[in-house]
Amino acid sequence: MQEQYNPSEIEALVQKHWHDNKTFEVTEDANKEKFYCLSMFPYPSGRLHMGHVRNYTIGDVVARFQRLQGKNVLQPIGWDSFGLPAENAAINNKTAPAPWTYENIEYMKNQLKLLGFGYDWSREIATCTPEYYRWEQWFFTKLYEKGLVYKKTASVNWCPNDETVLANEQVQDGCCWRCDTPVEQKEIPQWFIKITAYAEELLNDIDTLDGWPDQVKTMQRNWIGRSEGVEMTFGVAGHDKSFDIYTTRPDTLMGVTYVAIAAGHPLAEIAAHTNPELAAFIDECKNSTTSEAELATMEKRGVATGLFAIHPITGKQVPIWAANFVLMNYGTGAVMSVPGHDQRDFEFAKKYGLAIEAVIKPVDGDVDISEAAYTEKGVLFNSGEFDGLDFEAGFNAIANKLVAEGKGKRQVNYRLRDWGVSRQRYWGAPIPMVTLADGTVIPTPADQLPVLLPEDVVMDGIQSPIKADKEWAKTQVNGQDALRETDTFDTFMESSWYYARYCSPHADEMLDPAKANYWLPVDQYIGGIEHACMHLLYFRFFHKLLRDAGLVNSNEPAKQLLTQGMVLADAFYYINEKGARVWVSPLDVATTEKDDKGRITKAIDKDGNELVYTGMSKMSKSKNNGIDPQVMVEKYGADTVRLFMMFASPPELTLEWQESGVEGAHRFIKRLWKLANEHVNQDNSEALDVSTLTSDQKALRREVHKTIAKVTDDIGRRQMFNTAVAAVMELMNHLQKAPQTTGQDNAIIGEALSAIVRLLYPIIPHVSFNLWNELGNASNIEDSQWPVVDEAALVEDSKLIVVQVNGKVRAKITVAADADKESVEALGMSDEHVIKYLDGLTVRKVIYVPGKLLSIVAN
């Protein structure tokens, strides 16, 4: 055996073995239990970052653990390779997105291989290839045929100077990133998929996701946002028009003092003809990119329209205001305002001098709305015939009256909106729809799929090449001239079904149902919690679409979800001569000084600049505090990086990158290597004979099997990889102190090392592969079984009992494991230390906690 641990040499040899033997390639096997382990696939940005490494190490640990459980394990990888960053890079590098993307894929693929991840590379997919997006296009046409796809106008960011649509990322301080022209909101036709048709099922099935984090489930419930309420009709005074409003608080209807409508509401447009102030306000709102999320913090503003709404019960007239906090694309575009019982309405009413009336009060007292709205549920008053009713009775009575008079209906609403999948970008899958000469819009016929995205293009930074090239759109369908859709799919489309394509990546159909139903659902999915409400919801939605198309037979795409925390690193900067911050990589910090609590108080970089330390923050390009995984692998080896990633923090919490911790992980591997090297050079001919073991040998063997039990539970059930590593480290400490003088000493250490290399195999597979062979095993570690606990080894011949006198530990005694209270008490009382502390006292009570504690109370 090689005496020194040389990671680069070992890892290259082991990775070559895996590659040559196609170790991780799998096929369906009805005789084996399957396990599908999947980490969210990366965008090929150019280089892996530590966030990737953490995600993929967790996935690899789970996959390798399950493999040693004897399961048929699928762990695939691919590339989420469409998207705006490729367009921006192509513009900056004067190239096309395709070659930039494919070069990055090759580079990052090699990085993944260097880290030793056990992927089935034969299933690799890239979503930007026609072989992949062809089936996405095909499926979209099927959804259209089922009535689940439609087209309507929706607002986009529009640069009037370049006459092009901008992504949200391309709007900087309300202006175009390229020409600094103020951005407008423009309504253009776009394609939508009816996710709302599945809202109820998506919500209800959250209750079946037992293996998903509660936080993700709560976020999805809130995002779907089911509410029960009443949709009611308000008339418009002096007009033959009416409009609808939805509310979840009909009990407050008698307190409505004004109505707020979106600036884009038809009533606002009508009123603006004779109201210049309102017309200007509408134009201003049109050009603001207010998202629903920003509404909570923005200044609430409005303009009176001059119109009045007719209260559906009292007939009273209340003013209609156009307000910037009402969105036309959310609900009906109008809200009833009850400033006495809604804080936003209260503040708006105070600002503009509108009436505030209280109609709800606490059950046991009066209500004061002089300083703030009373927003709790309570008892109705000032509400005419409804006075004295509580929330539920008031809700029902008012709802029933509105329904009976034909002025309203009970309704279940969802916050969830239909999925807009159109993007006015180039680097995405073309939407497979065509417009015939007579204006009819139809799906592209199946025999004309895929609609190919041309890859040999020139990016001018203004318009999508397929929009600029008028010839590209021209086609023929059934002998008629037609024009192709020039929008491309939202890239969430590709990531919504990739997990299923891995099951049959080379099939000449979207999915091979037999293969898909063997592997699906995914047993373990791993990715960041930031994807909770977008990707993970579309992921679930698409699975139900696939099910209803007869392609899969399960209801949900993944049984278990692990959301790993972010990777943080120290961040430093200095101020340059221009007064700007220059962020310095932690690798370029030459010296640091720390206080007695270990906090950095002073830092100087390699160029002598005194640095400001801003603490730990998420690794990012903007703060230049990302650590290149490749640099760490070259310095310490992949196994060290993997071990640190698993040991430094529980998986769902943030991980603080500390090179001192990486060095500690490296030292541990060297200790393991040294112990194994010493062992293989011993005479190990004597087989383990448990019947001849001394008490010390039994105690050491007990530690081995306790560790097997703990690590098995920590990795397999609890997914607490850090405590699993800690348990093995503790066992290593016992082994290093253990004698190696007899044949049975060596036999126990041999058993322990055999267990340790398998327990650590998921985490440090290269070292484990090598040591497994050095320990004399004929087959490779991938073909071995996870170590099994010997229950007999856990049985203790004796117990160490703590003896307390009046609450203080005074002695520790060893007793037979099956000793009764009387014998333990007798032994404890006869201990010389106990006798000393009982001298002159009378024993009043003795408490025995079996196998742990003897407590003596005396005075």
From Swiss-Prot:
Coiled coil spans: none
* Reactions listed under catalytic activity: tRNA(Leu) + L-leucine + ATP = L-leucyl-tRNA(Leu) + AMP + diphosphate
Q: Does the keyword Transferase apply?
A: no
GO biological process terms on file: leucyl-tRNA aminoacylation
Gene Ontology molecular functions: aminoacyl-tRNA deacylase activity; ATP binding; leucine-tRNA ligase activity
Gene3D superfamilies from the UniProt entry? 2.20.28.290, 3.10.20.590, HUPs, Isoleucyl-tRNA Synthetase, Domain 1
Motif 'KMSKS' region: list the residue ranges: 618-622
Chief location bin = cytoplasm
Q: Which GO terms describe its cellular component?
A: cytosol
Where is the short sequence motif 'HIGH' region located? 42-52
Q: Where does ATP bind?
A: 621
For the protein in the UniProt heading, the enzyme class is ligase
What does the UniProt entry say about where the protein is found? Answer: Cytoplasm
Q: Which UniProt keywords apply?
A: Aminoacyl-tRNA synthetase, ATP-binding, Cytoplasm, Ligase, Nucleotide-binding, Protein biosynthesis
CDD domains to which the protein is assigned, alphabetical: Anticodon_Ia_Leu_BEm (cd07958), LeuRS_core (cd00812)
The family database entries (InterPro entries) matched by this protein are listed as: aa-tRNA-synth_I_CS, aa-tRNA-synth_Ia, Leu-tRNA-ligase, Leu_tRNA-synth_edit, M/V/L/I-tRNA-synth_anticd-bd, Methionyl/Leucyl_tRNA_Synth, Rossmann-like_a/b/a_fold, tRNAsynth_Ia_anticodon-bd
In short, the EC number is: 6.1.1.4
Q: Which family does it belong to?
A: Belongs to the class-I aminoacyl-tRNA synthetase family.
**Would you tell me the protein name for this molecule?**
Leucine--tRNA ligase
What lineage is this protein's organism placed in?
Bacteria, Pseudomonadati, Pseudomonadota, Gammaproteobacteria, Alteromonadales
